[in-house]
């Protein structure tokens, strides 16, 4: 006779698993990858231990060398909202012979051997009216095709914010440095040759646009300068001078 009250003990068993013996599969894979990454990172660090003897400036502008500033021009510009105005295009006002001659005479003495390590284009921007609440923005191109005529005004598209009212660009080409040591002699020989064959053969000639985040037309003061990073060598002079030597 079939018993309706038959009960299998196996149907009522409950199994309790302790979580400390089980891990999520994703966690196991992530930990394995993390451990492998740490091991590779330690190997890479050990391969660079010999570089700990050297010091490198976080910002090359403040690194070794002497900074010589050449102010090209100061101007006041009106900038309309949502637009940026061309401020540097090397059309001629950047190359006033009197300004360059005074700079060369003061910065590059004849008796010293000096080498240009880098050139920075710095643009200092300030509002002419007080209590104006907006930020300065800028864009630049290091190089362009020969014969390219840049537009005077462009729309603002993904600009860079100007920090501390100063926009600074390194103009050094790949490899950097200027191969000519006696810059004073190269300049006095020919002004045009110095610019074309010494400066622009080794450094970029950029175009720069500046604008504001203001919704109104703003009047801004621009100061455009070139900062030469100079490596200076001791002059060839005897250690002792005088009648006893």
Curated annotation (Swiss-Prot):
InterPro entries assigned: Polyhedrin
Keyword line: Viral occlusion body
Origin superkingdom: Viruses
GO molecular function: structural molecule activity
GO cellular component, one term: viral occlusion body
Transmembrane segments: none
Biological function: Major component of the virus occlusion bodies, which are large proteinaceous structures (polyhedra), that protect the virus from the outside environment for extended periods until they are ingested by insect larvae.
Stated family: Belongs to the polyhedrin family.
Protein name stated in the entry: Polyhedrin
